[in-house]
Regions:
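Signature of N6-adenine DNA methyltransferases within the class I
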Residues: 8-32, 45-70, 77-252
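Polybasic, glycine- and aromatic-enriched phosphate-binding surface used to engage nucleic acids
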Residues: 229-351
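Short, hydrophobic beta-strand segments that form beta-sheet elements in well-ordered domains
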Residues: 39-45, 56-63, 268-269, 331-332
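Residue-level preference for the first positions of well-ordered beta-strands
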Residues: 40-41, 88, 137, 329-331
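Long recognition/docking surfaces used for binding and targeting
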Residues: 1-7
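Sterically constrained small-residue positions within well-ordered secondary structures
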Residues: 35, 178-180, 322-323, 348
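Proline-centric
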Residues: 35, 80-81, 128-132, 193, ...
Length: 351
């Protein structure tokens, strides 16, 4: 999300293709306070220079010449040689789905630990890790979901191997970006720091941008489990992986079309099941089966789904299947404000 000192993004910013979103001054100030190192500084997606204007002598890189500030290098960040090294890398990397990343950037970003499920901001993180000198710091604002995203598992393992996230500010539901999703986090990573000690702050519903001037810090332990990054209050000798494994549910990409009491052929545990205990009757399509009659009128919409490549031979299939097993399980409603997101249910199908 390339940066600027304004809050409202103008219409000429390329949000979908380039991930261009303005960085509010309160965010910039908070992130600048996390800088500890002296030495060479890089802002890899500098936009109009929200950070760069406070960092004399820093190298700024911006792919869009319309917004590059004076002195910035107008280039694709992934063209920067890995032989470069920086004491501090700071900024707001672009949030772009893989399918929307330009072909040129895709080619340049090949050969990383990531794959075609990864958002562009994850490729930025991976590239920055290679550019950090020993003891170097990476200070970013990103979606917080990388901590537990399946697409980020190899990157998270690499980060944990290389160092520690020394500061992490969960911004909660603060709407700091116009026309952009909340659920972001500000964090600082230090290469070579293996203390596993993290200063952690979580902003609540009543907090405002002013809270960033003095975050409510607490001490946490930085852990990695199954490629997921955690900030825990204690060390836990028993890991979830010792007694269970985690699987994610199916994704249709069009629940309103696949949900049908009349044409459905399988009951699914869904996000509302935790509240009412009810399952959802849905149209399930096994690979190799012909398209269900109920979906034929919706072919044009279904083939245009972007969760995976669709053609004339598979347009009726779900975007992602689910692990089929009769093993006992505990369901977790992953995106909820419920204090108790865990529940059990006899149904073994889940989305």
């Amino acid at each position: 999300m390339p940066s600027s000192s304004a809050i409202v993004a103008p219409s000429d910013y390329e949000v979908a293709a380039l991930g261009q979103v303005f960085t509010p001054p309160a965010i910039v100030d908070c992130m600048r306070k996390l800088v500890r190192n002296t030495g060479r500084v890089l802002e890899p997606a500098c936009g109009d220079g929200a950070f760069l204007q406070h960092l004399p002598g820093a190298l700024g890189i911006e792919i869009d010449p319309r917004h590059a500030p004076p002195g910035a290098e107008v280039m694709n960040f992934f063209e920067l040689s890995d032989d470069e090294a920086f004491a501090t890398i700071i900024g707001n990397p672009p949030y772009v789905r893989y399918q929307d990343i330009s072909p040129g950037t895709r080619r340049l970003a090949r050969g990383t630990v990531l794959d075609k499920r990864a958002n562009l901001y994850l490729f930025f993180i991976e590239k920055c890790l290679r550019l950090l000198e020993p003891g170097g710091e990476l200070i970013f604002i990103t979606p917080r979901d990388f901590l537990k995203a399946t697409s980020a598992v190899p990157l998270n393992r690499l980060m944990f191997e290389l160092g520690t996230i020394t500061e992490f500010i969960d911004l909660g539901d603060l709407h700091l970006f116009d026309d952009a999703t909340p659920n972001c986090a500000i964090w600082r990573f230090e290469r070579g720091n293996l203390t596993r000690q993290t200063r952690y702050a979580a902003l609540g519903f009543a907090d405002t941008a002013e809270t960033l001037a003095a975050p409510p810090w607490g001490e946490r332990r930085f852990l990695e489990s199954g490629g997921h990054l955690l900030f825990t209050r204690h060390d836990y000798p028993l890991r979830l992986s010792d007694i269970a494994f985690v699987k994610v549910g199916a994704v249709s990409g069009a629940d309103d079309l696949y949900t049908s009491d009349a044409a459905g052929n399988r009951d699914f545990v869904c996000s509302s099941t935790v509240a009412d205990g009810l399952t959802r009757r849905m149209i399930w399509c096994e690979p190799g089966e012909p398209p269900p009659e109920a979906l034929l009128p919706h072919k044009e919409r279904l083939i245009s789904r972007r969760i995976k490549p669709y053609t004339e031979t598979n347009w009726w299939l779900w975007g992602r299947g689910y692990y089929v097993s009769d093993l006992p399980r505990v369901y977790v409603n992953g995106k909820t404000r419920r204090a108790q997101p865990f529940f059990v249910h006899d149904c073994t199908n889940y989305d």
